[in-house]
């Protein structure tokens, strides 16, 4: 009987070890991976660990008395998700949505927010040594949300700090 208890504890211990190894492996496979997308002619990137899914543009229900860049809310399989238009957040002129327009559903600090982008490009690996600090500039709303500049071959991707994009004065996007 005592032998069975020891075996069970040993098996549970091994299972816990395997679960921890799987978590580490999952983190490693996402390390340095970024979802890239376009706003106008510029390429942007967000760390893949914050991305839940990408959906096509759909009906957005307006909510009164909110900031202009918050387009409203969507019902995603029973979950109500606030949606912001990244163009408007960056103070770029609004543009009519096309068949390439997507909503990137993100999650940070247990807050789920959809980001409307002109077009999703791909998932890229951008190693840390290929990411430079953001340029020192005080011009424009966009620079406030830049985490760095990623170099991919001859191209650059503007790395977005999702926390700063979603939080305005320490409040989540949907709070007043």
Placement of each model-derived feature along the sequence:
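An acidic, low-aromatic, low-complexity terminal/linker signal
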Residues: 1-176
């Amino acid at each position: 009987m005592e032998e069975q208890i020891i075996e069970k504890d040993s098996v549970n211990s091994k299972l816990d070890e395997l679960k921890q190894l799987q978590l580490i492996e999952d983190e490693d496979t996402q390390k340095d991976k970024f979802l890239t997308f376009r706003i106008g002619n510029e390429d942007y990137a967000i760390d893949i660990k914050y991305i839940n899914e990408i959906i096509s543009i759909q009906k957005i229900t307006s909510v009164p008395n909110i900031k202009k860049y918050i387009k409203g809310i969507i019902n995603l399989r029973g979950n109500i998700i606030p949606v912001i238009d990244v163009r408007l957040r960056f103070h770029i002129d609004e543009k009519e949505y096309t068949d390439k327009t997507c909503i990137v559903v993100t999650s940070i600090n247990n807050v789920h927010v959809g980001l409307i982008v002109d077009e999703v490009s791909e998932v890229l690996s951008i190693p840390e040594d290929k990411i430079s600090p953001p340029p020192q500039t005080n011009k424009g709303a966009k620079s406030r949300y830049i985490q760095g500049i990623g170099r991919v071959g001859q191209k650059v991707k503007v790395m977005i700090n999702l926390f700063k994009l979603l939080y305005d004065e320490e409040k989540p996007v949907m709070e007043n």
